[in-house]
């Protein structure tokens, strides 16, 4: 038990946030509810009824490759449900995980001075025509006309919109800079061949930040600051990322880096030097010379999923829209810009791809939709007398461990065996599964505790369970 406690206490820690109580239902399982009087019952969580693999997969567009572990698991478990090619319904478990991810992102962005905004998804064509990206983006840009014939696009990114906003402020001073403005919103891209579920879709969530500085030197400092925040984010999530030099593509600029999760199904080809810290997307390298440009050692090739991208833009956009500020000498000066993206839904899917087994979802500890699932005995079984104990344990956990209020599910499907419910809990990847089995009838009662992220199983008393769960931190 001591080893189990030590490992669980080592889980990433973040400040606990308050939670909304919507979604709680009156307790049907145990009549003696605590003051809050609510329990989260698994039977009330919305799940698609037709989760048989053949049925779910038949709903997919025939051009959509189902060769990706995360996509298969998310469909089979009921985390997502197909809507149309490249578009998915995000179901309750996924929404909870995504909201937690957004909270972690908010913490990291605001820790470096980021201010959250929300820009329209509809972007006027003239903004994109000014930068020539209306044509450069080609068919990937989703375009439409309103009833007056005015053209718009559904923005995949917002460099034009944010720069036009800053340009409209005519009395900006250097004393107000830097601005670090970011949003977490839906984005759209007309992918010719959507694939791999949330890894490459037509509609997705992205965090995009745009920075405005008073000088190239200050902009480079901001660039490093945001990159460090990205590193901190992925470290907190426990994801094995690599930062690589990258091409600027249609966004432009002079410096660019990608944050990649190395995995076999990744669409990006990476070159990593095992001797030094050099790493790059292979599209930036001369393929005829595959030695490290830093130490001349041989480069190792791998594949990766891009989950973040950073760009130092300079004055590429500010010069077009005349986004200026008044410098220390009182002269109008173009702002130095950067832009920074995180694929929110892609991070979720990529994390499942990297961390999960072939049959069971595994989450970054901070992002698990629920931290624990409690399984009472089957109705009519010899252990049914322990039902009251598991209800009391649920109430005690949610009252005595404030950060776990709203983080614990009670699997009240007591018509099913413990084994069947444990199998389901394993598939969903709750970090902790607590079972009232035969040993719950002992004096004192012992609960079977599965720690999914370490693979350990222990039999603990009520006090032992509390010692295990009290250090768990949520976001």
From Swiss-Prot:
The keyword Aminoacyl-tRNA synthetase applies. Its EC number is 6.1.1.15. Residues 1-29 form a transit peptide. The keyword Ligase applies. Changing residue 95 to I: In DEE75; uncertain significance. It is found in: Mitochondrion matrix. PROSITE patterns: AA_TRNA_LIGASE_II. It is an enzyme of class 6 (ligase). GO terms for molecular function: ATP binding; proline-tRNA ligase activity. Its main location: mitochondrion. It catalyses: tRNA(Pro) + L-proline + ATP = L-prolyl-tRNA(Pro) + AMP + diphosphate. Signal peptide: none annotated. SUPFAM superfamilies: Class II aaRS ABD-related, Class II aaRS and biotin synthetases. Keywords: Aminoacyl-tRNA synthetase, ATP-binding, Disease variant, Epilepsy, Ligase, Mitochondrion, Nucleotide-binding, Protein biosynthesis, Transit peptide. GO terms for biological process: prolyl-tRNA aminoacylation. Pfam families: HGTP_anticodon, tRNA-synt_2b. One of its GO terms (cellular component) is mitochondrial matrix. Mitochondrial aminoacyl-tRNA synthetase that catalyzes the specific attachment of the proline amino acid (aa) to the homologous transfer RNA (tRNA), further participating in protein synthesis. The reaction occurs in a two steps: proline is first activated by ATP to form Pro-AMP and then transferred to the acceptor end of tRNA(Pro). It is linked to Developmental and epileptic encephalopathy 75: A form of epileptic encephalopathy, a heterogeneous group of severe early-onset epilepsies characterized by refractory seizures, neurodevelopmental impairment, and poor prognosis. Development is normal prior to seizure onset, after which cognitive and motor delays become apparent. DEE75 is an autosomal recessive form characterized by onset of severe refractory seizures in the first months of life. Belongs to the class-II aminoacyl-tRNA synthetase family. This is Probable proline--tRNA ligase, mitochondrial. It comes from Homo sapiens (Human). The lineage of its organism: Eukaryota, Metazoa, Chordata, Craniata, Vertebrata.
């Amino acid at each position: 038990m001591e080893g189990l406690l030590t490992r669980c206490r080592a889980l990433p820690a973040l400040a606990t946030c308050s939670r909304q109580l919507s979604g709680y239902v009156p307790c049907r399982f145990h009549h003696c509810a605590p003051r809050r009087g609510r329990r989260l019952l698994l039977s009330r969580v919305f799940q698609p009824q037709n989760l048989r693999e053949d049925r779910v997969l038949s709903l997919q567009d025939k051009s959509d490759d189902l060769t990706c572990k995360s996509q298969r698991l998310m469909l089979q478990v009921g985390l997502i449900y197909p809507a149309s090619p490249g578009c998915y319904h995000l179901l309750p478990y996924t929404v909870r995980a995504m909201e937690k991810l957004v909270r972690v992102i908010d913490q990291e962005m605001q820790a470096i001075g980021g201010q959250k905004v929300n820009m329209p998804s509809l972007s006027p064509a003239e903004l994109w025509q000014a930068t020539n990206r209306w044509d450069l983006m080609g068919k990937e840009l989703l375009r439409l006309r309103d009833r007056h014939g005015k053209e718009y696009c559904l923005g995949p990114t917002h460099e034009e919109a944010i720069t036009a906003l800053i340009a409209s402020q005519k009395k900006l001073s250097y004393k107000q800079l830097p601005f670090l403005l970011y949003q977490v919103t839906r984005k759209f891209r007309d992918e010719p061949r959507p694939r791999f579920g949330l890894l490459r879709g037509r509609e997705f969530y992205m965090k995009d930040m745009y920075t405005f500085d008073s000088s190239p030197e200050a902009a480079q400092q901001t660039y490093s600051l945001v990159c460090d925040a990205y590193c901190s984010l992925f470290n907190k999530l426990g994801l094995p990322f690599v930062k690589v030099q990258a091409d600027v593509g249609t966004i432009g600029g002079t410096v660019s880096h990608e944050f990649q999760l190395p995995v076999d199904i990744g669409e990006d080809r990476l070159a990593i030097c095992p001797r030094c810290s050099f790493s790059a997307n292979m599209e930036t390298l001369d393929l005829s010379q595959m030695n490290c440009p830093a130490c001349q050692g041989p480069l190792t090739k791998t594949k990766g999923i891009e989950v973040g991208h950073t760009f130092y833009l300079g004055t590429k956009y500010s010069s077009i829209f005349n986004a200026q500020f008044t410098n220390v000498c009182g002269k109008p000066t173009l702002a130095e810009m950067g832009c920074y993206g995180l694929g929110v839904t892609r991070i979720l899917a990529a994390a499942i791809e990297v961390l999960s087994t072939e049959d069971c979802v595994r989450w970054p500890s901070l992002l698990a939709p629920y931290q624990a699932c409690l399984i009472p005995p089957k109705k009519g079984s010899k252990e049914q007398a322990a039902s009251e104990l598991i209800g009391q344990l649920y109430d005690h956990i949610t009252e005595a461990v404030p950060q776990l209020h709203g983080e614990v599910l009670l699997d009240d499907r007591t018509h099913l065996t413990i084994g069947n419910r444990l199998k389901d809990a394993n598939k969903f990847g709750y970090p902790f599964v607590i079972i009232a089995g035969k040993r719950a009838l002992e004096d004192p009662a012992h609960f079977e505790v599965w720690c999914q992220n370490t693979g350990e199983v222990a039999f603990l008393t009520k006090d032992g369970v509390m010692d295990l769960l009290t250090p768990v931190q949520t976001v």
